[in-house]
Amino acid sequence: MYSCGLVLEGGGNRAIYTSGVLDAFMDQGITFPYVIGVSAGSCNAVSYIGKCRGRQHDISIQYSGDKRFMSLENMIKNGEFLNGEWLFGELSYDLSPLDQETYDRANTTLCVVVTNALTGKAEYMYPKDFHKRGCPILRASCALPGATKGVVLGKDRYFDGGVTDSIPLAHAYEDGCQKAVVVLTQDRNYQKQPMGHARLIRRIFRKYPLMTRAILNRYKIYNRQLEAVWDAQGRGDAFVIAPDHPLHCPTLERNTDKLEQIYQTGYRNAMEQMDALKAFLALSLIHISEPTRQ
């Protein structure tokens, strides 16, 4: 049983908004016993638990335009536009390593959402050791359909967890969280629209018909989840931090000026709600350390 958990939506490079929010949390000494992340949200979760302030910001700003990260050259060479092998290998271990010792000391439960291509359903994994180069579970959670081939874990192939459970608040409750703080990467009025190019999607994933169905129905599930999140806040069971305006940021945005603005928006939105958040956390018996920055 956890008094309060943290739920992190993904969104590709739009999740730099979450990076700003979590850096504000670190500055204010806010930690959680349980964190669940989806796609880029899982990467944010790892840096947050490891107290690597600024790590996700720097990765997004410094490497979003790097051809090793995403490019047509990768597609020609490896058959993947997004180079997960480089992202979760050289970048995550050599260029911008995680503080593994600090992560281990945190004693925080991390849940990562992935999508099973065969069943078309979300699965929930609990990685503990990030010493293994490649971070296969994180890589699977970030394996964007169409831009990657997915990741094989065991006998099955997995893709981005956002396909099937973009905002896993319900699973946080199932895992024993009494309350939750939810960080979204879309504004309150956002509604996801049906995806186009259905024929192309069916062709690409013809070996995985249930995955195809999940992709095409994602907008329905997402919009229901959004409604559930705001309802939970209305009941006092959740505290939601979301952009105060539409971010107009594609999943694979490379414009570093725009990304920096989104990061600053996340930090500002978190600080603007900090007093209310701390009051919510106090009721949830969450310990808050002394702020490291004012």
Which sequence ranges carry the predicted segments?
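Short "domain-exit" segments at the C-terminal end of structured domains
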Residues: 290-294
